């Protein structure tokens, strides 16, 4: 069943519009799916669709990709995606969902995180088609607000309204400090919509208060208020908590194909259809009936999206080859060995010694000649096998015997 139960008038059954307003949508306001569908159908210009991201972490996971995919759908329908880097608001810290104030980042940390965010967002958004994407930073306008302008902005909301925000209310009632600068965050995010003249703003369900603040400030400034579209928060691999790197229940967008595949083929049964709806374009009516086949299709589909179909096929073959004695070798629990510090070209026998799978290069050669060494489940037969670049090894599983493994990685994993 679709997450959104919204019904769209047959007059607006353009498949691109239907996908935008129906699939993977939690709420659209004001007016619901039909109102936004009508606005999209009757638009005489590309709409400006805003998504703000605060670069508080250096990497993205599948949970972040849900709203990025929704932004891409607007691009595919001919509208302008505005990817707003909250380099100024990141210095404040979004209090949403926080039981205490966020640690404040340095400008250098924010800029480095923004750089990696953009690299990873390029896996989903259209960065190539002219006129389909604007990348902006809210320091362009927020850093230049005068004190009088800031006071005028703060005068648009009361303390009572701020304390109605669930996160603030819970902390206030619990006696946990709520700092004045945190009250600024919803106002600054809302002011971004004014500065960008946004027609639509996207966000997770936890951003509802901030999105509505944007509408209020646009009305205050005499602009047409934006539509707000929220998407569900994706549960992590544990099956219940929001996907988060801190909870170790995530799938990173930059993970190698085998790691990504191995995690996704074990998504809990009750979440598989939800993952398909939020993370893919596969018609839900066409999903296999067999639960195991659904998991496999999900894993292959997402690896193909973020890597390639060939990488997905290879990851599936490798994962199957790593089934030993009926027990799947969990890639997340396999010790890692960093390969980017090696001098290339490098022999596999040297790697076997350095990573601790063999005590010496001579032992490594004997293990290879005895047929005990496998790379991604395939038996290695050449004791002099060597590799010219780290890219040939990254993400692969090195195995000696039945139970000794190393996952080869670039840098710290």
From Swiss-Prot:
CDD domains with a match to the protein in the record: S4, TyrRS_core
Residue window of motif 'HIGH' region: 55-64
GO cellular component, one term: cytosol
S4 RNA-binding domain segment(s): 346-410
GO terms, molecular function: ATP binding; RNA binding; tyrosine-tRNA ligase activity
Keyword terms: Aminoacyl-tRNA synthetase, ATP-binding, Cytoplasm, Ligase, Nucleotide-binding, Protein biosynthesis, RNA-binding
PROSITE patterns: S4
Catalytic EC class: ligase
Regions annotated as coiled coil: none
Function: Catalyzes the attachment of tyrosine to tRNA(Tyr) in a two-step reaction: tyrosine is first activated by ATP to form Tyr-AMP and then transferred to the acceptor end of tRNA(Tyr).
Family: Belongs to the class-I aminoacyl-tRNA synthetase family. TyrS type 2 subfamily.
Name this protein carries in UniProt: Tyrosine--tRNA ligase
Organism encoding this protein: Synechococcus sp. (strain JA-2-3B'a(2-13))
Lineage start: Bacteria, Bacillati, Cyanobacteriota, Cyanophyceae, Synechococcales
């Amino acid at each position: 069943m679709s997450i959104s139960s919204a019904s769209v008038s047959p007059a607006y059954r353009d498949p691109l519009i239907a996908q935008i307003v129906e699939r993977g949508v939690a709420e659209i306001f004001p007016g619901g799916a039909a109102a936004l569908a009508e606005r999209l159908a009757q638009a005489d210009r590309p709409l400006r669709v805003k998504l703000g991201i605060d670069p508080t972490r250096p990497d993205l996971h599948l949970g972040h990709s849900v709203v990025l995919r929704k932004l891409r759908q607007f691009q595919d329908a001919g509208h302008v995606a505005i990817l707003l880097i909250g380099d100024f608001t990141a210095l404040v810290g979004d209090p949403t969902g926080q039981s205490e104030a966020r640690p404040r980042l340095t400008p250098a940390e924010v800029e480095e995180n923004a750089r990696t965010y953009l690299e990873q967002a390029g896996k989903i958004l259209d960065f190539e088609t002219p006129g389909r994407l604007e990348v902006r930073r809210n320091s362009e306008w927020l850093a230049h607000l005068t004190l009088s302008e800031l006071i005028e902005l703060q005068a648009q909301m009361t303390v009572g309204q701020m304390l109605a925000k669930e996160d603030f209310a819970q902390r206030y009632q619990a006696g946990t400090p709520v700092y004045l600068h945190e009250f600024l965050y919803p106002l600054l995010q809302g002011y971004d919509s004014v500065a960008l003249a946004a027609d639509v703003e996207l966000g997770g369900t936890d951003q509802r208060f901030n999105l509505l603040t944007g509408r209020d400030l646009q009305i205050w400034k005499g602009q047409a208020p934006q539509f707000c579209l929220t998407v569900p928060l994706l549960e992590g691999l544990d099956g219940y908590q929001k996907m988060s790197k801190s909870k170790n229940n995530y799938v990173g967008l930059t993970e190698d194909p085998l790691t990504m595949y191995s995690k996704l083929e074990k998504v809990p049964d009750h979440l598989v259809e939800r993952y398909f709806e939020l993370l893919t374009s596969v018609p839900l009516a066409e999903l296999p009936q067999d639960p195991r086949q659904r998991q496999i299709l999900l894993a292959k589909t997402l690896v193909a999206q973020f890597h390639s179909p060939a990488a997905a096929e290879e990851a599936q073959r490798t994962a199957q080859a790593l089934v030993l004695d009926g027990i799947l070798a969990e890639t997340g629990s396999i010790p890692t060995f960093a390969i980017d510090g090696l001098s290339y070209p490098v022999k596999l026998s040297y790697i076997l010694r350095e990573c601790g799978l063999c005590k010496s290069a001579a032992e490594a050669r004997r293990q290879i000649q005895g047929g005990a060494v496998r790379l991604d489940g395939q038996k290695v037969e050449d004791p002099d096998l060597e590799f010219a670049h780290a890219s040939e090894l990254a993400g692969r599983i090195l195995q000696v015997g039945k139970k000794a493994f190393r996952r080869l990685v670039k840098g710290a994993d």
